[in-house]
Structure formats: structure tokens, C-alpha cells
Amino acid sequence: MAFPLFVFGGVFMKIILITGFLGAGKTRFIKTLVEKTTKSIVILENEFGDLNLDGEYLKNNNNNQDDIKVWELTNGCICCSTNLDFTHSILTIANTINPEFLIIEPSGVAKIKNIIKKIKTISYERIELGLPILIVDSKNLDNVLNNYNDYLSDELKYNGLVVVSKSESMTEQEFLEIKNILNVDNESVFPLIHYSKWENDIWENIFNTSGTIENIGNELSIRLKVNKNKIEKKLDQYTIDNIQINLLDKLSYLLLYLMSKRVGNIERVKGYLTIKNNSYKFDLVGTNYEITGSDKAFGNNVVIIGTDLKKDKLKTLFMN
């Protein structure tokens, strides 16, 4: 069995809040959202809410930890059920699973302001709020307005995207009527079609939006900004065979050095190494790396993927 030896690196995780009253269709929307990206995502279930994803979408891959239980979704997303304190749960996920995005689905009666306050206490350069999303049930809107208007007003105050669910057959005019009833301000995105018909740019903006939580007097405010996609450079791949490394400390140093961008913008490193009849596998993704024991020997080689690779320097590093 492979066993972790070293895990180092920074964490950068964006939190996407998806709220809505009981039965609004949050889980169905989350499933569609996850299917629209290849990014690494964790969905959190804890005392603020119950995820209740249908069993057919879950694999029972419990990791047997007492405080945090993990299931893997069929499309590679991870669902967490935890009995830790809410903020502790977020920090634990950031430092153990380290996803690009954490989707939090609170219960249908959770106070969103309280959740955002807690997120603010742990927001820093490596954890930030993403786009808050409100799911509005078109079939149950009158009931919510008549009986739970305070709850709905709280949610409308802290969102950047309003999604009308159960609206597959609605006309654009009917969407506009709901927008007017809710008095959605111009700062919130309000698509006039069901999300199954959205163009890719709406889905991309969900992942590209960053939020800053601010205190204005006694009130909280969220300032949102869409980060435009940069022009992507074509990734290059470089393979080095028969690498010459005889100490794990040296390998650890090399992987840290590769993150410095002195030998290129390196996105991924994967390799195998044998030292004193012990076999190891090493991986680097972004600013995180891991060295683990390997049951089998696969030689001494490394594959480096990135842009602007300084191949001569890379070869020197792994061959001396």
C-alpha cells in the first residue's frame, strides 16, 4: 500500500455558497454545475445543511476518519459529511483534500448572513468567497413570499446569481415577472432561461468570480469581481529518463524549487524513483507536492508539464 511521506505546498480554495429554501432544487443544480467543469470540487455537508445527494450519484468510499467522512461522486467530485465546527470543517478540507472549489449547500432554513460571517473569519489569501448563488423555486415562490419573506430577503441580500428552478417551460416574460417580484438589483445576474439552456460563459463566470466580504457599519457587504480568463499558453511536456537522485531530501528540495518558476511555469510533475531498493512515486500539482511509497518499481524517470520550460536546467537538476 502506498503511504504518504511528505505533503507540502500552499492552499487556494474558493467557496461557492448555493442557497435556497427547502426543496428549491439546490442539489440538482449542484449536480449540473459539477458536470460543467473539470475543476476539483468538494461539496460540504455539516451542521449548516444536509446535502442529501441521491445515492445513485455517490460511491461509498468512506475514509474511516472519525471527524470527516468522504464519499466520491461518480464524476470525480467529493462529498464530505463532517461533525466538526463549520470553520474548522472548511480549514480541514482545505488542508487535507485541497480542492480548487468548495461548494457549500446550507439547509433550506439557514441564515446566510451567519454563514458569511463565519467564512469572513477564515478568508485570507488562500481561502476566499466565490459567487453566492440563490436558487428560487418557481413552483413554490408564492408560499415562500407569504410565509418566509424574511428568510428570502436575507438570501437576496447576499447573492450574485439568482437561478429560477423548475422553470424549463417558462417564457422570458415569466422570468421577468419573477425578477420584478423579487426586486432583484442590477448587481445580481438573473438569467432569463432555465440553467439547462445556459451558454458556457455563465457557467465559466461562476468559477471565475471572486468575492470580498466587507463590513459597512453593522451590515455585511459582498463585493464581487469576475476574473477574465487569461490567454492560455500551450502546455509543453518534457520527459527525463534515468534521473540521478539518491536522497528523498534532495527530491523534496527539487520539487519545492520547481514551484519557484525559475525553470518555467510548471503545472504538473509526475515521476518514479528507486533509492536503496525502496521505490517511490512523486507528484506535483500547482503549489502542492506529494512523495509516496510505491509497491512496484517503475524505473527512475520524471515527466514535467508546463509552459516556458527551461529544459537544459531541468535536466541538470535531475541528473546531478
Where are these regions (language model features)?
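Short, Lys/Arg-enriched N-terminal segments with co-localized hydrophobic residues
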Residues: 1-12
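Conserved C-terminal guanine-recognition region of P-loop GTPase G domains, centered on the G4
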Residues: 110-111, 115-130, 134-190
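Flexible loop/N-cap segments at domain edges
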Residues: 304
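Short, hinge-like loop/turn segments at secondary-structure boundaries
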Residues: 59-62, 121, 150-152, 180, ...
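Nucleotide-state-sensitive switch-loop elements of NTP-binding domains
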Residues: 14-19, 24-145
